[in-house]
Amino acid sequence: MEADWRRIDIDAFDPESGRLTAADLVPPYETTVTLQELQPRMNQLRSLATSGDSLGAVQLLTTDPPYSADAPTKEQYFKSVLEALTQVRQADIGNVIKNLSDSQRDVLVKYLYKGMSVPQGQKQGGVLLAWLERITQVSGVTPIVHYISDRRTV
């Protein structure tokens, strides 16, 4: 059954029309992830990063990100992510990115942009830009387009 495209109310989808609220734009989540649930994962992330297993650390942080967590929990988790990303040697970044799946690269780009938008990440701007440069060399701009179009935040 086809929808009559002439009868679609496009103003209902315009965020500036006043019909949509900020809550309407947030994707629904079934459960909320707490800091206590993420703590073992954060500890594992730190131990992988400090032991030199950069591929394992980046794969862990890009697999199943805590989209449904509240803002303070996401911030605590992001600190662990930033620690892990900054401990990877510049020479290893390309190999790590090549071993990630497309969806993991998309999540990594979300963390990189988040890092560039917060003060603790801006201090590591050169490292974050090196990661972003290598991602665009491997995948092109596709992960950046996915970051822009995805409503889920890390």
UniProtKB/Swiss-Prot annotation:
Pfam families found in the cross-reference section: P16-Arc
InterPro entries listed in its UniProt record: ARPC5, ARPC5_sf
A biological process from GO: actin cortical patch organization
Phosphothreonine PTM sites in chain numbering: T142
Annotated family: Belongs to the ARPC5 family.
Role played: Functions as a component of the Arp2/3 complex which is involved in regulation of actin polymerization and together with an activating nucleation-promoting factor (NPF) mediates the formation of branched actin networks.
PANTHER family in the record: ARP2/3 COMPLEX 16 KD SUBUNIT P16-ARC
More info: Present with 3060 molecules/cell in log phase SD medium.
This protein's name: Actin-related protein 2/3 complex subunit 5
Underlying gene: ARC15
